[in-house]
Amino acid sequence: MMHRQIVLVATLLALAIGCARPPEPRYEARGAEVRLSLLALGDWGRRPKEGQTPAKQLRVAEALAAEDRRAPADALIFVGDNFYPHGLEASEVEMRLRANLVGPYCHFVALTARGAATLGEACLEPEARRHPLPLWAVLGNHDTSAESIALERERVPLYVSNWKLLGLPVETVELPQGVSLVFYDSTALHRTANAASLPLLTRALAQSRGPWRVLVAHHPLDGREVDVPIQRALAAAGVRAQLLLAGHIHDLRGAAGEAPQPAFQLVSGGGGGSESSHQTLPGELYQLASTGFARVDLVGAGASAHLRLRLFAVSAVDVPRVVAAWTVSESGAVTSETLGSAAE
């Protein structure tokens, strides 16, 4: 009798635990129709406490790796504010790389011999399970000291071979899938002293091969006066980008734009915090104060080809999930579908 009672209690406990456990996230696997996949997040490099990765950054990084395991991506894009509060400093390079880059994004990094020797213990995922991707980064407004720029450009790749800082101040990466990624330093181009660099942005967009054009910068175009020179430079190119990937605002957003500005702005600024400004972007369709990340897929070919844009919310109280999704056609037509919300 006692044995039966113990078995019954154990069974009920297992059922209770099973009922309390949140459902597993379900995302479709990457199908053959997906020609290119990019993951994106920004504003992630919060200062470690006692050398430990901040909990919010770690949660987002783990969700990012889980999404890549389900549907492998082709590149991970960091949209700035990589190292708070004043960028990367020479006296703490290895500590910051250990806690802010190699540890949380272990799934994606490729360590050099030097990186493996000095930081390898921070990368806990077995090497056989990792999926190193190109790590393409732009500067944020917290990264702009001369020391940090030099360290992010030259020192980080000595430890992490697949890290590359782009957009100093403008740089284009042409991908074989017909996607032109135009990276630019929005903090620098906001400054009147750097006005002479704005034609570089015009030229880069005008000369991009396309037909798909994605701008990558830290700041979204949020209607401020400081954005006007950048908007004029984009308009002068004579070709329109379908997408601007940005961060800076510490939340998740989507906004449609009017020609000749980018057809859509996808804000993925929740890599390490969710201190949303709650201000509204021009053409805003969605806003969620949550940590998380974004995914961009190029789907299909010919007349049916489109960009599929998704925002993933990550929190301490819920499983990571898609909360908003849109498609953007080659001509810039936007179709939206809001899937839900999540609390941080």
Positions of predicted regions on the chain:
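Bacterial N-terminal signal peptides that target proteins for export
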Residues: 1-7
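Alpha/beta-hydrolase fold active-site loops
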Residues: 36, 74, 178-179, 212-214
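Extended active-site neighborhood of metal-dependent phosphoesterases/phosphodiesterases
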Residues: 25, 49-51, 85-212, 229-243, ...
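A short C-terminal boundary segment appended to hydrolase-like catalytic domains
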Residues: 285-344
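N-terminal active-site segment of His-dependent metallophosphoesterases
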Residues: 19-96, 195, 218, 224
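Bacterial N-terminal signal peptides
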Residues: 7-16
